[in-house]
């Protein structure tokens, strides 16, 4: 069987126009996949040079396949139909290891055609390392590496106004472009670089904050043999992802023309502020996940897909989103409902098996950040508590009992993953309930009164403790399926 490379699979190669910090699965199935579509269907003509920002030889460089690799995009489309789309990605030209090829790395700054810089160096990547120096080859932190490269470009082109870059970090932190620019300017000051360089950074480089959204499941280890037979070649870099994707860029409108987004209808939005889109994602996608997990798991289900195909639990999630989350968000209603429908399709994706227990990690913090804001806003706007969101809180408290109904009358124990503070507190409280020394009302009040966690005393929210206690009582006495019926 043939090996995937440009000799065996010749085709068009694009000039270097994009630098990408990060070689991982996400960027390859998200940014590179979109750029490859733009290269095929428009005149973008942008080749990608990947810079490996860490000192590691694992996995091997994409150079072993001349930059070629295959994406398998699969899931439910907008019509609810299962789709599967293999694609040979041809837009990556080469990969540079900055620790072993530092001169080649700096040479990228000398290329007048380079225009865009993408990155995904993990949430910890946009960080400050005090010991980084201009003379390091390379510096440790990603922002310092980038500052060194930008300074090289500034010097090589003598501060030319038309040689600035558009920088689009994809790290999962709020206002990632703002954070990255702040650190670049910090290094410029620390290294005592010229004021003209700082002015060039500010005036002729565009740092965009972004929001990225796609579940990338990466290398499909169990399917490799079948994929090789289907595609007719060996690929060490298969990359799988869901059908849905969204790229929100906080930046100038002229970006649409530069990236040729005006010539191909991709799910990319160029906006003035990404905050409403971040709130939408956290509230609808992440919030629905967090509400679903304890309800579905205590109802005897184990995966997100299985839960959404369960008539009772699926209806609970749909109504929670439509009636209690969407109405309190500040974006056009049609955008919110469209995104909500996409989320439901993503949850039902038959190609992804999301284990509920794995999503349950740090559930208390997730409830505070993902659901509590909508719960409190709903009460403020409607004068009553949202019954399904409070039920999700009752279910979460029940979940931390650490056991669910199994075969017959047997109880099935399961691992809990959270902060030690909560694990110890719940263990004590539920032991007290079992021994009849703590009532459910007392348990709920202890949990809601923890202002260090909730950033307020939730027992002061009128009716909340009583409603959650009543719902928890129903779950304990009747079981989750009987308890949730009233909310479907």
Curated annotation (Swiss-Prot):
Signal peptide: none
Catalytic activity: D-altronate + NAD(+) = keto-D-tagaturonate + NADH + H(+)
Domain of life: Bacteria
InterPro entries for the chain: 6-PGluconate_DH-like_C_sf, 6PGD_dom2, Altronate_OxRdtase, Mannitol_DH_C, Mannitol_DH_N, NAD(P)-bd_dom_sf
Spans through the membrane: none
GO cellular component term, pick one: cytosol
Pathways per UniProt: Carbohydrate metabolism; pentose and glucuronate interconversion
Binding site for NAD(+): 18-29
Keyword Iron: no
GO terms under biological process: D-galacturonate catabolic process; mannitol catabolic process
EC number annotated for this UniProt entry: 1.1.1.58
Sample GO molecular function, one term: mannitol-1-phosphate 5-dehydrogenase activity
Keyword S-adenosyl-L-methionine in record: no
Keywords: NAD, Oxidoreductase
Catalytic class of the enzyme: oxidoreductase
Family of the protein in this entry: Belongs to the mannitol dehydrogenase family. UxaB subfamily.
Protein name in UniProt: Altronate oxidoreductase
Origin species: Pectobacterium atrosepticum (strain SCRI 1043 / ATCC BAA-672)
């Amino acid at each position: 069987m043939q090996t995937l490379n440009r000799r065996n699979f010749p085709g068009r190669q694009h000039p270097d126009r994009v630098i990408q910090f990060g070689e991982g699965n996400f960027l390859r199935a998200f940014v590179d996949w979109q750029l490859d579509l733009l290269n095929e269907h428009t005149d973008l003509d942008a080749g990608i040079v990947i810079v490996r920002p860490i000192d590691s030889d694992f996995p091997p460089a994409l150079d072993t396949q001349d930059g070629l690799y295959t994406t398998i995009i699969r899931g439910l489309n907008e019509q609810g139909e299962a789709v599967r789309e293999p694609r040979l990605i041809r837009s990556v030209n080469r990969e540079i290891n900055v620790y072993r090829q530092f001169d080649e790395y700096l040479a990228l700054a000398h290329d007048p055609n380079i225009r865009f810089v993408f990155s995904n160096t993990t949430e910890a990547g946009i960080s400050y390392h005090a010991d980084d120096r201009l003379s390091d080859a390379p510096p440790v932190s990603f922002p310092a590496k980038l500052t060194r490269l930008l300074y090289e470009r500034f010097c090589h082109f003598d501060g030319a106004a038309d040689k600035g870059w558009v920088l689009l970090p994809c790290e999962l932190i709020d206002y990632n472009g703002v954070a990255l620019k702040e650190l670049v300017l910090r290094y410029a000051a620390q290294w005592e670089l010229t004021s003209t360089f700082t002015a060039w950074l500010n005036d002729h480089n565009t740092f965009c904050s972004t929001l990225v959204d796609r579940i990338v499941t990466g290398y499909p280890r169990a399917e490799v043999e079948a994929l090789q037979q289907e595609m007719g070649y060996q690929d060490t870099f298969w990359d799988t992802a869901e059908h849905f994707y969204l790229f929100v860029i906080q930046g100038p409108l002229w970006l649409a023309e530069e990236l040729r987004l005006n010539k191909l209808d991709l799910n990319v939005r160029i906006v003035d502020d990404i905050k409403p889109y971040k709130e939408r994602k956290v509230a609808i996608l992440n919030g629905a996940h967090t509400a679903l997990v304890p309800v579905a798991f205590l109802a005897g289900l184990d995966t997100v897909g299985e839960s959404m195909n369960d008539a009772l639990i699926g209806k609970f999630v749909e109504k929670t989103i439509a009636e209690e989350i969407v109405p309190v968000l500040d974006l056009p209603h049609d955008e919110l409902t469209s995104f909500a429908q996409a989320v439901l399709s993503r949850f039902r994706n038959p190609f992804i098996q999301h284990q509920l227990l794995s999503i349950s990690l740090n559930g208390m913090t997730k409830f505070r950040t993902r659901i509590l804001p909508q719960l409190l806003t709903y009460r403020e706007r409607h004068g009553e508590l949202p019954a399904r969101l409070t039920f999700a809180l009752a279910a979460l408290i029940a979940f931390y009992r650490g056991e669910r109904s199994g075969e017959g009358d047997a109880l099935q124990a399961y691992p809990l993953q959270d902060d030690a503070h909560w694990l110890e507190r719940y263990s004590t409280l539920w032991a007290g309930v079992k021994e009849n020394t703590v009532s459910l009302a007392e348990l709920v009040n202890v949990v809601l009164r923890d202002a260090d966690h909730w950033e307020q005393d939730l027992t002061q929210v009128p009716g909340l403790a009583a409603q959650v206690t009543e719902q928890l009582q129903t779950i304990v006495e009747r079981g989750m399926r009987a308890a949730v019926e009233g909310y479907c």
